[in-house]
Amino acid sequence: MKIAVIGAGAWGTTLANTLAKKGHNTHLWVREQELCDEITNTGYNSVFLPDFKLSPDLKCSSNPQQVMEGADYFLLVVPSQFLRSALADMKQYFPQNPAVVCASKGIELNTGAPMSQVVFESLEGLNPRFAHLSGPTFAYELSAELPTSIVLGCGDEKLAAEVQDIFSTPYLRIYTNPDYRGVELGGAIKNIMAIAAGMADGLKFGHNTRAALITRGIAEMSRLGEAMGAQASTFMGLSGMGDLVLTCTGDLSRNRQVGLKLGQGMKLNEILKMRMVAEGVKTTESVYFLAKKLGVELPITEQVYKILYEDKDPATAVCDLMNRDLKAE
């Protein structure tokens, strides 16, 4: 059995390494040849996962054909805004009915498409079998083999059971959920809430504020999710509540760090000069316009959007949230 992992960021490298350590024939596609050579020659990904030596059994290449040819499973771990273009470039290397597991978190800008829609549209004619992997995970902690649980959203029971077995280890527990739409949306929207929580912490607003943002964040997830066909109950699970709590409270969260710096007075363009992929920045824009299109009220998302893209003062945004019309929970 061969597994092709597309994307060698921190999360892609961690998942590929986890699979290789378990004994699976795992091939990692690395976009930059220089980084690919480093991984091959030293066993380290110094750019995205510098603290961990990778399994000597992990194979990597910058040639997508070499990585994908003959693969039984395809794990997609590229930034959400680049998934469509990556699949367009690589479509020729997918077989018919490929087993595709997506671990990218986000909503596509301009189209408002979740990752499942991007995959189905990009691989039209190939009839992919689709699953989405999400949940409360920091790459660093999984690489350190700290106990971790995530969820696989998949409507195909056979594929769900296969992937669950492939990924499960003594330190990584995989649950399944047929609601892949809810699983993927939870993993995307929580990044917006993490930015909001980071800003609140940067403003020294305290634990009460953070708890309110997390709780009302779940409400926003559920409202948008139901409007897009997801089950509200999914957002109380690992990809919703679990991931939301982790990214709103954990210092390893890149989205929370962006919010923290904004709350401390830094400007977004300064923050983005750092080499960190904070999916929530683009996802905020995508979800803001998607919610307008669907007529779904997302007050936290709206204020985060105004801070990021209209230079609104974070403290003023929080005050505006608190002074909205009073209503039932």
From Swiss-Prot:
Keywords: Cytoplasm, Lipid biosynthesis, Lipid metabolism, NAD, NADP, Nucleotide-binding, Oxidoreductase, Phospholipid biosynthesis, Phospholipid metabolism. It catalyses: sn-glycerol 3-phosphate + NAD(+) = dihydroxyacetone phosphate + NADH + H(+); sn-glycerol 3-phosphate + NADP(+) = dihydroxyacetone phosphate + NADPH + H(+). One of its GO terms (molecular function) is glycerol-3-phosphate dehydrogenase [NAD(P)+] activity. GO terms for biological process: carbohydrate metabolic process; glycerol-3-phosphate biosynthetic process; glycerol-3-phosphate catabolic process; glycerophospholipid metabolic process; phospholipid biosynthetic process. Catalyzes the reduction of the glycolytic intermediate dihydroxyacetone phosphate (DHAP) to sn-glycerol 3-phosphate (G3P), the key precursor for phospholipid synthesis. This is Glycerol-3-phosphate dehydrogenase [NAD(P)+]. GO terms for cellular component: cytosol. It is found in: Cytoplasm. NADPH binds at W11, R31, K105, A139, R254, V277, E279.
